[in-house]
Amino acid sequence: MMKNWVDPEAKAEAERYDNPIPSRILITETIENKKQPLSHADLVEHFEITDQKSIEALSHRLSAMVRDGQLMKDGYKFQLMTDQPVHDATIYINNKGLGVASLDGKKEEMLLPERELRQVFHGDRVKVQQTSIDRKGKAWGFVTQVTQRRIKQIIGKLAEYEGEYFIQPANPNAHQPITLEKELIEHAKVKVGDSIRVEIDDFPTREEFATGHIIQSMADKANTEIIIPQTILEYGLPFEFPDDVIKDAESFKEPNEKDREGRIDLRDLALVTIDGEDARDFDDAVYAEKRSGGGYRVVVAIADVSHYVRVDKPLDEEAKERGTSVYFPHFVLPMLPEALSNGLCSLNPHVDRLCMVCDLNLSRSGKVTSYQFYPSVMHSKARLTYTQVAEYLDGDSNAIPEDRAVRKSVNTLFQLYQVLKGLRAERHAMEFETVETYMTFDDLGGIKEILPRSRNEAHKLIEECMLLANVAAAEYALKNEIPMLYRVHEPPEFSRILKVRDYVKLLGLPFPEQPTQKDYQAVIEATKDRIDAPSIHAVLLRSMMQAYYGPNNAGHFGLAYDAYTHFTSPIRRYPDLLLHRAIKAHLQQKPSPLSGGALEEAGTHFSATERRADEASRSVTTWLKCHYMQQHIGEEFVGIVSATAEFGLFVTLKDLYVDGMVHVSQLGDDFFVFDQASQSLVGQNRGQSFSLGDQVRIKVAGVNLDDRKIDFELVQQLSHAGRAIRSRAPRVAQPRPITKEEVFNKLFDERPKAVETETGERPVRKKKPKVKSTELSKKTEKKSVVKSAEQKAKDKAKKKAKAKKKKANAKAKID
């Protein structure tokens, strides 16, 4: 082969290959010099390669260069990666080990090949470049840098394979093991199958697995005791406060005269907290009174966390990293140390507390006429619970303390709530019919019961007060051009709207192509009393976009507000703390502590920490439900079809509030097709159909703890489209007379069968000698044959006469 090129790597290529092809350096230089993308054929022609082996070798080299992030392939053309932008992204890996890089600030993903996934864990932050677009139009990427490792420690079971020890993470999204030295195993005195906690020493590369060392053996712990710390580590949640952070938090004392300077004193006001029975940190207190000229005054006092968490201090850095408190089923991972979250920042009863206040005036009709924000000092008059207040509003005067001012305020709050409830309906804020649950636990952290949680009037009263303050804060920031993070909830995407519209039309309800909150709420109202309301509302909910934090106001679609933010929970949400700082800075005529690009980055970060917390909490809840259902394998329950897909039905059990799946193969002897419009699985042969809201009886077939999946088997469909389905008795044929032959056959079948003798042989029956046919029998046979022939001749003649007569009649008609 004649070479028509000068290769800077020619010597190295010649040492490695008998028949060298252009090196990677030469290929990149050639594409760069041509200043345009080149195909494989273009390069073959340029280098004048003629033999088939070298042509194929060049093709393999180009593919390898794409794989290694040196070239980008677009269709059949190759171009330099330097022309491709670098994106910040987060790694997401599913339970099958397939992964994508989700690009920041975009609704786009890049698929990652197995080689790229070797060097990352689920949740890692990376920089990626696009390398190719496949035939389905999906982008593939290359990891140029891992910028942040989410997982630093992990809990899993010790395993061994061919003398090599490793820990296999239990999280279904953890796709690769962490290797351990045999000496470390022996020193820690752990054995295969034990749960252990490991710290990662060397993170994985494209060529090697991660390595680590054992921190703690957890072999003596029950699985239910391990699941929360295991999840905390797997999601990279900060779980231990550093010593300097604890020291910072504990350095503050009870509010003194100096702390109260420049604050409005509200200690004589009958402010109270209203929270759940198990609440320990109290962010907010409320008070209401009727104004002399008509209307209402509402005071919403929020813990002044910004007084204690100072910018750039260790305490602030730790809170910023956490972003939010994480609420597991029976454990809270707080954003702030306990000295603040349950102490100085918590609006505990009968002690002075520093707060930020939203003081509002409302008209008789509930419209906000004015508001102001200011720092204050308060003294809570009572720690009330939702249950106490609800019972008091229902007529139990002993449910809350005998404090006249407190009772008067609670009564006024309830009157105002009745007014605000009407305004909520007028603006068409969405109120979905969903069932919230809570769990009770045993001593080892396992579920004892799953029970429905009811929202009473006290819950809704406090919710309306918080909405008033949050909306006022958003309007205040807009009016005064204060840089801050809005809570943004955008309208649904068109593709999601189409799915909802097709489904809602089948319910006989109108739904436009560009729906407003009014259109959504109309469907909610029209279906709220139906038995399948939760399933219908779940379809509407799934069409909603995910809310996020951002510096640009885009309104809140779900709540039907033009502007909205979070002001009321700074103990557990860092964005609320940022807003308090921004309002304080404005009141003091100082520049805002955060603005521009830094504010945008903050919005991205806190949206991510919120999602991380939600995913971690959901993962634990799902695991605990799976663990709980292990004791019910083989039992039958009644459930409601809550979602449908091509591969089966998702069913929520009525009594246990647990979700599982009935695979399409378990639905019966039919071929089922998924109908997107009606959200149904329809049998093509027998017409049986399964839709949202259908009631079914299932049997718990199996539980997979690692994958967090519960499998059901269908026992019986109990209802469809709101109508009960009665069990049908099997069809029975009508009785007919029994023939002689059947009688004799039955008698023959009922005769005792021959049994074996003691020797094991069956007795042999002697055959009767054959008897020759008599003359009589021969005559009878002959006669029947003759008779049969005569009968055939008669039938033929009769048929001929009938045809002749028909022909004559036809002729008469024509004439």
Q: What would you call each of these model-derived segments?
A:
Residues 188, 627-629, 688:
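Outer-membrane beta-barrel proteins
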Residues 91-93, 158, 641-643, 702-704:
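Non-cytosolic beta-sheet module surface loops
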Residues 124, 141, 663-706, 710, ...:
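Intrinsically disordered, low-complexity linker and terminal regions at domain boundaries
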Residues 45, 183, 192, 197, ...:
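Electropositive polyanion-binding surfaces
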Residues 108-113, 174-180, 657-674, 722-728:
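A short macromolecule-binding patch
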Residues 103, 169, 363, 442, ...:
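Acidic/polar residues at beta-strand termini and the immediately following turn/coil
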Residues 128, 198, 644, 698-700:
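A generic structural signal for residues embedded in beta-strands
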